[in-house]
Design a protein with these regions (language model features):
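Broad, structure-driven detector of short, well-ordered beta-strand segments within folded domains
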Residues: 92-101, 175-178, 240-254
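Structural boundary/hinge residues at secondary-structure and domain interfaces
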Residues: 19-166, 171, 217-240, 278-314, ...
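A conserved glycine-rich beta-strand in the N-terminal activation segment of trypsin-fold
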Residues: 167-242
Length: 362
């Protein structure tokens, strides 16, 4: 959990128009790809309301978990060592994964953020971080580099993902951080990083968002995050073949005062798409009944509030659309109301945590 919190800080970002999502460097053979863009000017993250919301959330979380008080110090430590401003609205990421038939997974992450390459190198050398090589590009052991940045990140580094290897196979390469230039970091195992770096230098063809998917992304207004899956690049199974599933796309965007989410799944035919449309619409129809609960049992104030929040959230979800071989789910939430919902959920969680029995200390 600590690692996830730290990584969330490191890759915080969001948006430009869909055509400006930068997939350069992402291998075209990845089954799953994702990207974000600059969040500059967005109400969800780069507005007075967003900053006030973030400050309130930080205060609430600090009361719940004292270790979160170290987040500012951690950000400052990262900036001092690398020059990276984690709160810059211009930070962006892109990447993806490919899946093997035996369950093995490989992939990479491209972090586009302004940083000081000389400062990063000097820090890594001073902290004796192990070096790695991706072709002609020098890098550092990701786990060791993370641990060297701050005490809080050193604790998180213990949960750093270790690439799995098959029994009897040679030890897998560690995940590295490779500094391509003052605006680009590549995070991947050395062999994969070398492939990504070649693509960034124009050697080969990178992934490109298919023109048929752009309308779904653009329909969110000003899109700031996209996630796409291509079933043809997934390991073949009879179940996948029978389903007719071809792929899916998820996009988040901002349109005026609203946050828009679109999820579309594509199938080989209208007939193959129909079961998914029916299942999705059925789940939406059942949701209010599930929220109603058992009228014979008394509800606590907390349960009533959580039900009200769930109902408010579901109110933003529109009926499922089925058009030919495509099934689409759309949701729309007012940005300020969304802030309010998230804040209430965290506050309820904090209240429950404080009321829970505390572990005995000697």
């Amino acid at each position: 959990m600590r690692l996830l919190s730290c990584l969330a800080l490191v890759i915080t970002s969001a948006v430009l128009p869909a055509q400006d999502f930068d997939f350069k460097g992402v291998p075209a053979d990845y089954a799953i790809v994702f990207a974000t863009a600059s969040s500059r000017g967005l109400k969800i993250s780069d507005s007075p309301e967003a900053k006030a919301f973030k400050a309130r959330m930080e205060k609430t979380l600090a009361g719940l978990d004292p270790s979160t008080k170290d987040s500012k110090e951690m950000q400052e430590a990262i900036k001092a060592a690398t020059g990276i401003d984690l709160e810059s609205p211009d930070n962006r990421i892109a990447g993806g994964v490919t899946l093997g038939a035996a369950g093995q997974m490989s992939g990479g992450l491209i972090v586009r953020t302004r940083h000081d390459s000389k400062k990063l190198s000097a820090h890594a050398v001073a902290k004796k971080v192990s070096t790695l090589q991706a072709g002609a590009t020098k890098g550092w052991n990701g786990q060791e580099l993370l641990a060297s940045l701050s005490d809080e990140l050193a604790k998180a580094a213990k949960d750093f993902p270790t690439p799995a290897t098959a029994p009897g196979a040679p030890a897998s390469e560690p995940i590295g951080v490779f500094d391509l230039d003052d605006n680009t970091l590549v995070i991947a195992q050395p062999k994969e990083a070398a492939r990504i770096i070649d693509l960034l230098k124009g050697k080969g063809t990178s992934y490109a968002l298919n023109a048929s998917l752009r309308p779904q992304v653009n329909a969110t207004g000003r899109p700031y995050a996209v996630f796409a899956m291509n079933a043809a690049k997934l390991p073949a199974t009879p179940e996948l073949s029978d389903s007719g599933f071809q792929g899916a796309i998820f996009a988040m965007g901002e349109n005026g005062s609203n946050q828009i989410m679109k999820i579309s799944a594509f199938f080989t035919s209208k007939e193959k798409a129909a079961p998914m449309a029916m299942q999705a619409q059925g789940m939406l129809a059942m949701a209010p009944m599930m929220l109603a609960g058992d009228p014979s049992k008394p509800e606590t104030a907390e349960e009533k509030e959580m039900k009200a929040l769930a109902a408010e959230f579901l109110a933003g979800v529109q009926p499922v659309e089925a058009a030919g071989n495509q099934v689409t789910l759309t949701a729309k939430w007012d940005t300020l109301k969304l802030f309010g919902m998230l804040e209430k959920i965290v506050a309820i969680g904090a209240t429950k945590a404080k009321a829970a029995p505390q572990p005995l200390t000697k």
